[in-house]
Design a protein with these regions (language model features):
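Helix-loop boundary and gating motifs at the non-cytosolic
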Residues: 1, 5-33, 102-103, 138
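Loop-to-transmembrane helix entry
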Residues: 21-40, 85-86, 162
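Loop-to-transmembrane helix entry/capping segments in MFS-fold secondary transporters
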Residues: 26, 113-126
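Helix-to-loop junctions at the C-terminal end of transmembrane segments
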Residues: 42-55, 145
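Intracellular juxtamembrane helix-capping segments at the cytosolic ends
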Residues: 100-114
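A membrane-interface helix-boundary motif in multi-pass transporters
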Residues: 142-172
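Multi-pass alpha-helical transporter architecture, strongest
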Residues: 161-199
């Protein structure tokens, strides 16, 4: 699931800045830094979520927030305050999505791996996700953007962003369904694992 999740996740890193600029958000690069600040907040909140909900539900929350973010980007814009708010909430959800999924997945990998193999396990996961997953995501992202290129520009927009983000969101929904059905973990262990890491 982590490999598959990294494929649509690459869309955010590839397209978010250009998308925000085209829909009329000034200083898009600066505003996107809010996503990094939100990572700090959600990192601090992660122990609470792990203790209360357990690893599986927190991982699921990371997937769901990623899909919601793309959903907000599908309908966001600068035409009115509501649409602008959706853009900013979408940016802020980057921290929730990244921390709740990838940091929690790292914790889970650490808990499940024998002590002498933890470093190797983390390296393998990083290679599969940020290496292969990101590579496939970048390739698919390029093809997606080409597919959704407008033949006639609509104002400043040269791409059908609704389609781009909708496609990304649909992949995340598919990954989420796979995760729900195939990720099996004892609920008691799931909660205790999170507690053990932060003690």
């Amino acid at each position: 699931c982590s490999f598959l999740f990294c494929i649509p996740l690459a869309f955010y890193y590839q397209f978010a800045n250009g998308y925000l600029t085209q829909v009329g958000l000034k200083n898009a690069t600066g505003w996107m830094s809010l996503g990094q600040f939100s990572e700090i907040f959600f990192m601090l909140a992660l122990p609470f979520f792990l203790r209360r909900y357990g690893i599986k539900k927190v991982l699921l929350l990371g997937l769901v927030t990623a899909a919601v973010r793309y959903g907000f980007f599908m309908v966001g814009g600068t035409e009115n305050m509501l649409m602008v708010t959706l853009l900013f909430v979408g940016i802020l959800l980057h921290g929730a999505s990244y921390d709740f999924y990838f940091i929690t997945a790292s914790i889970y990998t650490d808990e499940k791996s024998p002590s002498h193999m933890r470093t190797s396990a983390q390296g393998l996961i990083t290679l599969i996700t940020m290496g292969l997953g990101a590579l496939v995501g970048n390739q698919l992202g390029g093809a997606t953007l080409e597919h959704y290129t407008l033949t006639v520009a609509q104002g400043n927009e040269t791409f059908n962003w609704f389609g781009v983000w909708g496609f990304g969101a649909s992949i995340i929904v598919f990954v989420t369904i796979l995760f729900v059905f195939f990720f099996k973990e004892n609920e008691e262990y799931s909660k205790n694992a999170g507690v053990n890491v932060f003690h």
